[in-house]
Amino acid sequence: MKRFVLMVGLVLSLAFLLTLPSGALAPQAKVPASLKAGVTQRLGADTDITIAYSRPGVKGRKIWGDLVPFGLAPGNKYSKDKPFPWRAGANENTTIEFNKDLLIEGNKLPAGKYGIHMIPSEKDWTIIFSKNNSAWGSFAYNQEEDALRIIVTPIKAPQQEWLMYGFEDLAGTSATAYLHWEQLKVPFKIKLAQ
């Protein structure tokens, strides 16, 4: 009788395990500290602009001039001791992609996918659109791969815990793209190239 009860218990336990979803017993993937995000805006009839990035949090830290230094970041072992710009997000390269030529702050940028890097300062910021869109961060940044550099002025903004990109001032064939993090917004104007 004990053997019978033991066998029934074993069969029921096995049946229960077989009914669990396949991932229930597998180790769970670790959630990254900076989640991936993206935003897309259409201009005109058929021009899509997509910014893909990862979203670090403020988490009580001083961001500008500290976590994100003003000027180029000092070199480290990943950059082979070469100073580098900020990756304009976290983890992988922040990218912008569009299917038609655009004017960025009045400067023509051909259709394509570009890595975005930034050089912050206390006054004006340099935004770099790099032909290298697949680097991990900015450690391997090479100025010779720049497609365009623009200078913009950041503005004070309400507190934003998680870094985000967005579009505002939509006018059919133009918009202002922006990075917003902590209490700062970094806008840059985009317009269809006619």
Predicted region positions:
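Positively charged n-region of N-terminal signal peptides that target proteins for export
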Residues: 1-4
